[in-house]
Amino acid sequence: MGMRPTARMPKLTRRSRVLILIALGVIALLLAGPRLIDAYVDWLWFGELGYLSVFTTVLVTRFLVFLVAGVLVGGIVFAGLALAYRTRPVFVPNNDNDPVARYRTVVLARLRLFGIGIPAAIGLLAGIVAQSYWVRIQLFLHGGDFGITDPQFGKDLGFYAFELPFYRLLLSYLFVAIFLAFVANVVSHYLFGGIRLTGRSGALSRSARIQLVSLVGVLVLLKTVAYWLNRYELLSHTRGGKPFTGAGYTDINAVLPAKLILMAIAVICAAAVFSAIVLRDLRIPAIGLVLLLLSSLIVGAAWPMIVEQISVKPNAAQKESEYISRSITATRQAYGLTSNVVTYRNYTGDGEATAQQVAADRATTSNIRLLDPTIVSPAFTQFQQGKNFYYFPDQLSIDRYFDRNNNLRDYVVAARELNPDRLIDNQRDWINRHTVYTHGNGFIASPANTVRGIANDPNQNGGYPEFLVNVVGANGTVVSDGPAPLDQPRIYYGPVISNTPADYAIVGKTGADREYDYETSADTKNYTYTGSGGVSVGSWISRTVFAAKFAERNFLFSNVIGSNSKILFNRDPAQRVEAVAPWLTTDSAVYPAIVNKRMVWILDGYTTLDNYPYSQLTSLSSATADSNEVAFNRLLPDKQVSYIRNSVKATVDAYDGTVTLYQQDEQDPVLKAWMQVFPGTVKPKGDISPELAAHLRYPEDLFKVQRMLLAKYHVNDPVTFFSTSDFWDVPLDPNPTASSYQPPYYIVAKNIAKNDNSASYQLISAMNRFKRDYLAAYISASSDPATYGKITVLTIPGQVNGPKLANNAITTDPAVSQDLGVIGRDNQNRIRWGNLLTLPVGQGGLLYVEPVYASPGASDAASSYPRLIRVAMMYNDKIGYGPTVRDALNGLFGPGAGDAATGIQPTEGGAPANVPPNNAPSPEALPGTPPSPPTAVPPAPEASVTLSPARAAAMKEIQSAIGAARDAQKKGDFAAYGAALQRLDDAITKFNNTQ
């Protein structure tokens, strides 16, 4: 029976078609409208920032990739459909029970819809997925050579970095396209009678056989190419159980030959498949495909497994030795740990040191860091917040400046930003939120090696940081008492101000000044932004676009927006850098600095690869996790890398948002490729000014990745490497409140890189022995401009206490625990241990330093402001302890050891300099007493003041309690010492409560 006439499908009425078109238009508008608005806003934003070429390059690249991939995949699928339809049988046997007939009728009635719509939809999806690989394609087009060849095939590493990923992507798309074309061809031939299934048998038309066999043959040929590319990918893969990344003995001697054999078999199978075009016998291609499958199981899987079990495992250390050496060399190259960067020196770690030797280490002992940036933020807030809407981040930053005596010092630094979440009541309405409270004010720095005075001193501010402030003062001029002069302390861009949704500010002259700036004793002074940053919202078109962008009608109706108005948005420094350099991975830390009298945010950018031959594959998230990152939820994305370079230093101006990218690594081939993709966006390294270079620091995340790798890859001998016997461990943070690895610390200390006593700014970390708590090494990375990036590793041979053992020894020392027990008695104060620093001192010795803080109450309440109360130290199992660095050093090494320390002395009389602002109440004085009791608590009244009998009696009791405390201390009687302290507390309370 011939094919029956095609039944006509019912037609839609004109009204129905119009309604459908309207509905489709609305859906398209809802889907595409926000994206079009976002694209237009991005175009404005990139243009204002001076990086419009980045926006257009990415957009054009993605569009072209989308177009090419969509046309390629959709075109191949369309060809499969079209060929099947055009070569369909003229007559198709049919009967009333044929289940295909109804589908055939539907397809024929909507032939264009199915014939064009299906390939178009597949092409659309393929294009959408493909455009996300624009990075891979740009690197293929612009990548160059590394100048290093792989040890197996002798190919330049640029092939693996830039070419191989593209070839793999192209092969994957061709494979998917041919497979989908095969499926489409099979379905079409089945619908139109080219394939007929009757009972247990079937029939193929000549056209169906030729087309399907050809497509299968092409798939087999693509598999042949895949086997060829798989050979190169062996060099960056990890076989289960190997202690290194890359091809091992089994891979080179079994898997690699197997790939070549399978490739040859695949070529033979492809020929067998294509033979069916002429021979008309499908058994031959079927046999070929079965042969390919069996070969892949036997040759590709079983044979390597046999070699692994019989030949390799019994002699693994010797068999893998050559390939471990390859991995050691490649990993050091890929992570910047080669001999021209890393210097190893033997260091005893337990050398004896005299007081004179310790005092001679002036660069170290005068810069011992007492302020822990993860603890002192509440003190910054208490003393320097000023207004409820100003705020400091929970973790502050460390930077260095030269003090007035031209000595290099490290400082805890912070920008006093505006935090929109802390606005209250009518401060939160749209006009105030976005046009009045627009910016922060001030750069705050505290010398990290000192505090205001001893916490138990008569003044109420002992133990708190000394604050050096650059801020807009009460008369509108800039008060520049900070560590460096600053012309503009207003902050419009920063991580805190952008930490809320819709972080935009509308600025510009539209009449009277609107932006809150500062207050005098009489009134509030406002300000108008004059910077170059911001996108104009003066026109009605712009106002409409941003009203849609932020879903805010006030853009259209508010009279505070005028022709000169601009909008500042995307104000997070890291996000701004990531937007203009989408190829960078940014460091989790961003810190403020004063450079050329401007406040800028500085952050580090990395270029990475994940297929560097033989280099260890590393998870950035795992490698950079430490107790700080976990506590503040700042973990990097879980990205796998086998190559990393700190290729870019970026700055973001805190006032106008200007983003500047500087080339840091002039040899990085990946950066060179991106500089060709986006010419002019990255400035050469020579453009880094000396003022900026003085504030660049070795990046923390890179250092953490490198120290984790140095734990293994410091080993030179491959047999020792295989045994893991000489591996190291990153120590856990010994602080009882921590839950991860000990973070590295920025310090100023004697120059490890130059091995002299000059002061150097460096990033340091201790390393433990493998699965033990004894020290194995001490790592220091220099941040000084002259030796920037040089890593020095002091290897420690003996059993020297690691951070955990040192912390245990300090916290369980009887004198320490007794004293802190008195201070924290009855939950009056919460004791907090600061960062445990490991410092080389003397001739081969290591000094552990741990500051001790206390805050009122038993918990971290909002009103609890930690202050430094003690300094604890350990050196060669001996403990030093006191209210100051000088006291602890003298107690540990003898008189004179602390002569070079930056001392803090009890302040005579009242409050010290830099008293807290008027609106900040002074915290309560700590009830505890240092080992050397204060000379007067509270301050003695002036001679002209006559005390009442009750106060005179209280003062007499105070003096008596102090004397008793001194006597108890000399005798070592801690019970009497505690009782004397309680008497002192009671006497002070009585003195304060009487008239």
From Swiss-Prot:
<feature type="transmembrane region" description="Helical">
    <location>
        <begin position="210"/>
        <end position="230"/>
    </location>
</feature>
<feature type="transmembrane region" description="Helical">
    <location>
        <begin position="113"/>
        <end position="133"/>
    </location>
</feature>
<feature type="transmembrane region" description="Helical">
    <location>
        <begin position="287"/>
        <end position="307"/>
    </location>
</feature>
<feature type="region of interest" description="Disordered">
    <location>
        <begin position="900"/>
        <end position="947"/>
    </location>
</feature>
<dbReference type="InterPro" id="IPR005372">
    <property type="entry name" value="UPF0182"/>
</dbReference>
<keyword id="KW-0812">Transmembrane</keyword>
<feature type="compositionally biased region" description="Pro residues">
    <location>
        <begin position="928"/>
        <end position="941"/>
    </location>
</feature>
<feature type="transmembrane region" description="Helical">
    <location>
        <begin position="259"/>
        <end position="279"/>
    </location>
</feature>
<keyword id="KW-0472">Membrane</keyword>
<keyword id="KW-1003">Cell membrane</keyword>
<protein>
    <recommendedName>
        <fullName>UPF0182 protein MUL_2505</fullName>
    </recommendedName>
</protein>
<keyword id="KW-1133">Transmembrane helix</keyword>
<feature type="transmembrane region" description="Helical">
    <location>
        <begin position="175"/>
        <end position="195"/>
    </location>
</feature>
<feature type="transmembrane region" description="Helical">
    <location>
        <begin position="18"/>
        <end position="38"/>
    </location>
</feature>
<comment type="similarity">
    <text>Belongs to the UPF0182 family.</text>
</comment>
<feature type="transmembrane region" description="Helical">
    <location>
        <begin position="63"/>
        <end position="83"/>
    </location>
</feature>
<dbReference type="GO" id="GO:0005886">
    <property type="term" value="C:plasma membrane"/>
</dbReference>
<dbReference type="GO" id="GO:0005576">
    <property type="term" value="C:extracellular region"/>
</dbReference>
<dbReference type="Pfam" id="PF03699">
    <property type="entry name" value="UPF0182"/>
</dbReference>
